[in-house]
């Protein structure tokens, strides 16, 4: 971004801080067909971006092929450890974690 410099006064460069109610990110499809979301990470999930990208790719591929993620959540297997992650954990329709600490620690 060569035209982006440090201004001497306030200008139009801003950021957005997003966080879900229970501080668990939402990685899911939306109600709009073909539109997928990776939101609510509070900015602390940047270090997980490669995994988030891979699990979103898996989710999108499955849903676009006809998988009903809402009734049968996609399972993502991590690349290196082969651990299974139930993507229903990050569903927009999940039950909120009432025991959440309300912080990035969950």
Which residues make up each language-model segment?
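Flavin-binding catalytic cores
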Residues: 1-16, 29-32
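Active-site loop of classical SDR/Rossmann-like NAD(P)-dependent oxidoreductases
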Residues: 16-21, 48
């Amino acid at each position: 971004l060569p035209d982006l410099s440090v201004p001497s006064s306030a200008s139009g460069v801003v950021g957005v801080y997003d966080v879900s109610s229970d501080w668990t990110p939402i990685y899911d499809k939306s109600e709009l067909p073909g539109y997928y979301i990776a939101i609510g990470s509070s900015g602390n999930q940047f270090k997980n971006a490669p995994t988030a990208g891979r699990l979103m790719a898996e989710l999108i591929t499955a849903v676009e092929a006809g998988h009903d993620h809402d009734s049968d959540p996609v399972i993502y297997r991590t690349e290196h450890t082969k651990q299974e992650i139930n993507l229903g954990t990050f569903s927009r329709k999940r039950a909120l974690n009432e025991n959440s600490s309300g912080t990035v620690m969950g």
